[in-house]
C-alpha cells in the first residue's frame, strides 16, 4: 500500500483561499490518484503545485495557467504528474501509477 498525504493549503500571492480534495489518500501501488484544488474566493489565473517529503523543504513542482499547459520544474516527471487547469477556479494534479516513493505532501496555492 501507498500513503499519499494531501494538505489543505492556504493561498499565496494575493491571499487566495484554496481547498484541496481529498485531504488524504491511501492507494495501492500502481494506481492513479487525482487531487483537486479549488480557488474559493476569486478566479485564480495561476495555480502552483508543490510537494514536500518528510523533513525536507517544500518544492515547487509546476505552475499552471487556465487553459494552458503546465510549466514543470526541472526534474519533475510531467508524464507522471499530470496537471490540468481547465477553469479559473479549478486545477487538478493526477499522480499516475503511484508507488511508495511518491508518498509525500502535495500542496496547491493560487494567485
Curated annotation (Swiss-Prot):
Recorded hits in SUPFAM superfamilies, A to Z, give:
Immunoglobulin
> What processes in GO biological process is this protein linked to?
adaptive immune response; cell surface receptor signaling pathway
Which SMART domains does the record match to this protein?
Answer: IGv
> What Gene3D superfamilies does the database record attribute to this sequence?
Immunoglobulins
InterPro entries xref list: Ig-like_dom (IPR007110), Ig-like_dom_sf (IPR036179), Ig-like_fold (IPR013783), Ig_V-set (IPR013106), TCR_beta_variable (IPR050413)
What are the Ig-like domain coordinates in residue numbering?
16-111
Where does the signal sequence lie? 1-15
Location in the cell reads: Cell membrane
Disulfide connectivity for this sequence is 37-108
Highest rank taxon of the organism = Eukaryota
Q: Which GO terms describe its cellular component?
A: plasma membrane; T cell receptor complex
Sorted UniProt keywords: Adaptive immunity, Cell membrane, Disulfide bond, Immunity, Immunoglobulin domain, Membrane, Receptor, Signal, T cell receptor
Decide whether keyword Cytoplasm is in the record.
no
User: Key word Zinc present in the record?
Assistant: no
Major site of localization recorded for this protein: membrane
Pfam families named among the record's database cross-references: V-set
This chain's function reads: V region of the variable domain of T cell receptor (TR) beta chain that participates in the antigen recognition. Alpha-beta T cell receptors are antigen specific receptors which are essential to the immune response and are present on the cell surface of T lymphocytes. Recognize peptide-major histocompatibility (MH) (pMH) complexes that are displayed by antigen presenting cells (APC), a prerequisite for efficient T cell adaptive immunity against pathogens.
Q: How does it assemble?
A: Alpha-beta TR is a heterodimer composed of an alpha and beta chain; disulfide-linked. The alpha-beta TR is associated with the transmembrane signaling CD3 coreceptor proteins to form the TR-CD3 (TcR or TCR). The assembly of alpha-beta TR heterodimers with CD3 occurs in the endoplasmic reticulum where a single alpha-beta TR heterodimer associates with one CD3D-CD3E heterodimer, one CD3G-CD3E heterodimer and one CD247 homodimer forming a stable octameric structure. CD3D-CD3E and CD3G-CD3E heterodimers preferentially associate with TR alpha and TR beta chains, respectively.
| Protein's name according to its UniProt entry | T cell receptor beta variable 20-1
